[in-house]
Curated annotation (Swiss-Prot):
Subunit structure: Homodecamer.
EC code: 5.4.99.62
GO MF terms held by the record: D-ribose pyranase activity; intramolecular lyase activity; monosaccharide binding
GO (cellular component) term, any one: cytosol
UniProt KW Ion transport keyword: no
Name of the protein described by the UniProt record: D-ribose pyranase
Chain's role: Catalyzes the interconversion of beta-pyran and beta-furan forms of D-ribose.
Active site, UniProt feature: 20
Organism: Vibrio vulnificus (strain YJ016)
C-alpha cells in the first residue's frame, strides 16, 4: 500500500504523467466539466471531499508553478479563497519557489478548463471554489 497522502489511483496516475506547464483543474461540485476533458469525480456528498483537502493532497504530490482562479472566488467566497492562498504560500515556503496566482473572470476560467489535462471534481459546495494548477518542475 502507498505510504504517501495520495491514495486515489486516478489522481496518482495524473500526477505521474504531468509535464511542465500541463494544467489540472480542481473544482467544486457545480463547475461544468467540458466534454472531452478527463473527469476524476471524487464527490461523495455535499462537502466530501472538500476543496481545500483536495488541494492539500494534490500539492503534497505535485510541483506547481502557478494557479489560476476566478476573480469571483475572492469576492464571493473570501474565507475559502484565503485558505487557498495560505496553502499556496505554504507551498512556496516548502519549495522555495515563487508561485504565480492569476485572476480571470469566471467565464474565462470555464473556457480555460477545456485545455486542462483533467478536471478533479470535489464535493465542495462553496461558490467559485475552483483552481487550475499549472505543473512545474522539481529542479
Amino acid at each position: 500500500m502507498k505510504k504517501s497522502a495520495l491514495l486515489n489511483s486516478e489522481l496518482s496516475y495524473l500526477v505521474a504523467t504531468l509535464g511542465h506547464t500541463d494544467e489540472i483543474t480542481i473544482c467544486d461540485a457545480g463547475l461544468p466539466i467540458p466534454d472531452g476533458v478527463s473527469r476524476i469525480d471524487l464527490a461523495l456528498t455535499h462537502g466530501v471531499p472538500s476543496f481545500i483537502e483536495t488541494v492539500r493532497v494534490m500539492l503534497s504530490e505535485s510541483q506547481i508553478e502557478g494557479a489560476i482562479v476566478a476573480t469571483e472566488f475572492a469576492e464571493v467566497s473570501p474565507e475559502l479563497y484565503q485558505a487557498l492562498v495560505a496553502e499556496l504560500q505554504c507551498e512556496e515556503e516548502k519549495t522555495g519557489k515563487v508561485l504565480s496566482l492569476t485572476h480571470v473572470s469566471h467565464e474565462e476560467f470555464k473556457q480555460r478548463t477545456e485545455s486542462s489535462k483533467a478536471v478533479v471534481r470535489t464535493g465542495e459546495c462553496t461558490p467559485y471554489a475552483n483552481v487550475i494548477f499549472q505543473a512545474g518542475v522539481v529542479f
